[in-house]
Amino acid sequence: IKQKKHHTLIENLRQKSHAGLILFSTGTTGRPKAILHDMTLFLERFQTPRPTLKMINFLLFDHIGGINTLLHTIFNRGVVVAPIDRNVDSILQTCAKYKVEVLPTTPTFLRLMLLSGSVPSKIPNCLKIITYGTERMDQSTLDALCNLLPNIDFRQTYGMSELGIVRVKSKARNSLYMKIGGEGVETKIDNKVLKIRSKTRMLGYLNAESPFNKNGWYDTKDIVDERDGYIKITGRTVDVINVGGLKFMASE
């Protein structure tokens, strides 16, 4: 990334004596963007004590979801398990060996888990919650999982590197409708597109213009359907395909 020796956003952090966190976008729709967070603000979301269960860090640390899993568990004095491999058999064996209670994963992994024949026979009894995010889930996959694993609670997650992970409440374990919010988070729907304003958002890009409007709203580009205060993501305003959290142009 070509920048001046002193970037204004970084200098502002130095003046406050705050640490910074830099994340990189995948660069699918252009060159990768360097996303700068103020770590003091970033960590504020973890200050409120919450119940924690033993979790496996399925998502890696180059993904905002992986960082969120680690910090949430540590701040709440929980136990996080680092997997050796991320294939279906290895993940399930690791969950069983270390009595993992929460599996944060992706719809792609859950589809592979169904196709592998591991459900329900190889699903360890210790698992209480499976969360899924980073890409859209389809209703048929969720229905199959809920029917085969009636004792596991399925919960949707939502977040992005620019905003971090926001709090989500699923309407039901077998529903794709959810409420998005949390401390310092506001949402609105503009022409069926979800927009979010967050107090713990990134400071900005180091190599691109700010994506926030003058009032601080961020256009997620997620098209949503709203019912009774809950929303379901139905598509994107841009021609990008998301597979397991990795983004590709439709032409690829």
Name these PLM-found stretches:
Residues 1-13:
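Structural core segment of the AMP-binding/adenylate-forming
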Residues 12-14, 18-47:
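Conserved AMP-binding A3 loop
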Residues 1-4, 33-36, 57, 79-86, ...:
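Short beta-strand->loop structural element characteristic of the AMP-binding/adenylate-forming
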Residues 43-54, 61-102:
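Conserved AMP-binding/adenylation subdomain of ANL enzymes
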Residues 102-104, 115-174:
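Gly/Ser/Thr-rich phosphate-binding loop
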